[in-house]
Amino acid sequence: MSVIEQNSVEYPPLIVSEAGVSDYIALLKPRVMSLVVFTALVGLVIAPVHLHPVLAATSILCIAVGGGAAGALNMWYESDIDALMTRTANRPIPRGRVSSPEAAAFGITLAIFSVATLGVLVNWLAGALLAFTIFFYAVVYTMWLKRWTAQNIVIGGAAGALPPVVAWAAATGSLAPQPIILFLIIFLWTPPHFWALALFRSDDYARAKVPMLPVVAGPDATRLQILLYTIVLVTVAILPWPLGYFGAAYGLTSVALGAGMLWFAFNVYRYRTGTQANRAARALFKFSLLYLFLLFAVLPLEVAAHAVAAMIW
């Protein structure tokens, strides 16, 4: 045996991550991020102080990246649950495309970047609110509430309701009733929306041992809670009109959309078995997305209409 052969050492093969750009984008939860960006834009546009376009774009980018960071940390911590659920089994970590340490590092890096950038370039109230939003979703909801209480969606919904508040703070450096109203609408919208999903995905949640309300309290109790929360949501969403915070266009839209939400929620409560029950839950889930989108979309249009009227008159 030669000296070279005697001293040769076999090294383990270098493990190269299979993750592509699309896998890291998936970690950001793009569909959730789109809702975050949309509601934040509304909060920014209706604020009485208008940021310089560069700062406005920076604010929205930071809020989007912060929301994505929270999503990545959520996927990192919940990879064991995701692997057990049909709806989430194809996410990057369960599929082995991204490792848990990579996802955690990715999420933490984005979180620090988004908060620091928003704080330094815009203002620290917005930065602090964004940091709280990420912490609440990634730690309070993901690591605690999701696995321990059937009220996980109710309390955890606060994180998803904060983006318009962060955006308003970015524009004004302060808080006011208007962003709090937007917060309350999203907060009250979250339980009917996600419990409708949980009704027709209850087997998935039960398999993963996630204590969603239909799994813990049963489908009938969930249907009642959906109806009650919808009644409160519709009422709270209409009130800003008579209170003078939003205009007639918003008010009429909220009344019309509220009637639709109540109708779909009542159908969920009424149909309790068979395909009709699943169909009603799916219909509410889909309509609730349209409800929130149209309700928020009318606000920038109202602001634009007032601006045009002011120029004319």
UniProtKB/Swiss-Prot annotation:
One MF term in GO for this entry?
protoheme IX farnesyltransferase activity
GO CC field:
plasma membrane
Q: How does it sit in the membrane?
A: Multi-pass membrane protein
Which is a GO BP term held by this UniProt record?
heme O biosynthetic process
Where mainly located? membrane
One Pfam short name: UbiA
Q: In which pathway does it act?
A: Porphyrin-containing compound metabolism; heme O biosynthesis; heme O from protoheme: step 1/1
Keywords, A to Z? Cell inner membrane, Cell membrane, Heme biosynthesis, Membrane, Transferase, Transmembrane, Transmembrane helix
Q: Where in the cell is it found?
A: Cell inner membrane
Q: Which reaction does it catalyse?
A: heme b + (2E,6E)-farnesyl diphosphate + H2O = Fe(II)-heme o + diphosphate
Top-level taxon in the UniProt lineage: Bacteria
Which EC numbers characterise this protein's activity in its record? 2.5.1.141
Q: Where are the transmembrane segments?
A: 35-55, 56-76, 98-118, 120-140, 153-173, 180-200, 226-246, 248-268, 292-312
**Which InterPro entries does this chain map to?**
Protohaem_IX_farnesylTrfase, UbiA_prenyltransferase, UbiA_prenylTrfase_CS, UbiA_sf
Protein family according to the UniProt entry: Belongs to the UbiA prenyltransferase family. Protoheme IX farnesyltransferase subfamily.
Extra information: Carbon 2 of the heme B porphyrin ring is defined according to the Fischer nomenclature.
Function according to Swiss-Prot or TrEMBL: Converts heme B (protoheme IX) to heme O by substitution of the vinyl group on carbon 2 of heme B porphyrin ring with a hydroxyethyl farnesyl side group.
Name listed for the protein in its UniProt record: Protoheme IX farnesyltransferase
Q: Which organism is it from?
A: Afipia carboxidovorans (strain ATCC 49405 / DSM 1227 / KCTC 32145 / OM5)
Q: Which gene encodes it?
A: ctaB
